[in-house]
């Protein structure tokens, strides 16, 4: 048994281990609860936080220098699965050729997808969170004007959810 424990890890298994990135290491050092995920194909670091820890983590990332929310969006992992609220942050500074980037993902239950709004940290979240609400039904608590953005106010359902059933007929009201 002792011999089995001391055997080196095969190279193929070693490659499959995900190494924490620079941002994840900084969050860990400063006591922020998160989970690091595999980086995307461009090498952008991805971290996962729970909805309860989004605001403290986002505030810390802003203080760390991630002063630009490039993109916020929703993702549906499939019928019966979780929804994801995703935030792509950039550290805009002197090195504009290769700015530091990180993506934060919050996995939410399909039945009650509620997450705090980051509008008060990055104003660019305003319409982006409204679009995620309109298309996926993700509720951003604390958003100053969370209402439909693209669909009519009386629209039923969330069109970009993978289990959405499109209505056979929708009557548009005359603008006059």
Curated annotation (Swiss-Prot):
Keyword NADP applies: yes
One GO cellular component term noted in the UniProt record for this chain: plasma membrane-derived thylakoid membrane
Localisation: Cellular thylakoid membrane
Pfam families xrefs: Complex1_30kDa
InterPro entries: NADH_DH_suC, NADH_quin_OxRdtase_su_C/D-like, NADH_UbQ_OxRdtase_30kDa_su, NADH_UbQ_OxRdtase_CS
Topology in membrane: Peripheral membrane protein
Keyword NADP: yes
EC number(s) given by UniProt: 7.1.1.-
Intrachain disulfide bonds: none
PROSITE patterns, A to Z: COMPLEX1_30K (PS00542)
Alphabetical UniProt keywords: Membrane, NAD, NADP, Plastoquinone, Quinone, Thylakoid, Translocase, Transport
Gene3D superfamilies per UniProt: NADH:ubiquinone oxidoreductase, 30kDa subunit
GO-annotated molecular function: NADH dehydrogenase (ubiquinone) activity; quinone binding
Domain of life of the source: Bacteria
Catalytic activity reported: a plastoquinone + NADH + (n+1) H(+)(in) = a plastoquinol + NAD(+) + n H(+)(out); a plastoquinone + NADPH + (n+1) H(+)(in) = a plastoquinol + NADP(+) + n H(+)(out)
Role played: NDH-1 shuttles electrons from an unknown electron donor, via FMN and iron-sulfur (Fe-S) centers, to quinones in the respiratory and/or the photosynthetic chain. The immediate electron acceptor for the enzyme in this species is believed to be plastoquinone. Couples the redox reaction to proton translocation, and thus conserves the redox energy in a proton gradient. Cyanobacterial NDH-1 also plays a role in inorganic carbon-concentration.
Similarity comment text for this entry: Belongs to the complex I 30 kDa subunit family.
Quaternary context: NDH-1 can be composed of about 15 different subunits; different subcomplexes with different compositions have been identified which probably have different functions.
Protein name: NAD(P)H-quinone oxidoreductase subunit J
Lineage: Bacteria, Bacillati, Cyanobacteriota, Cyanophyceae, Nostocales
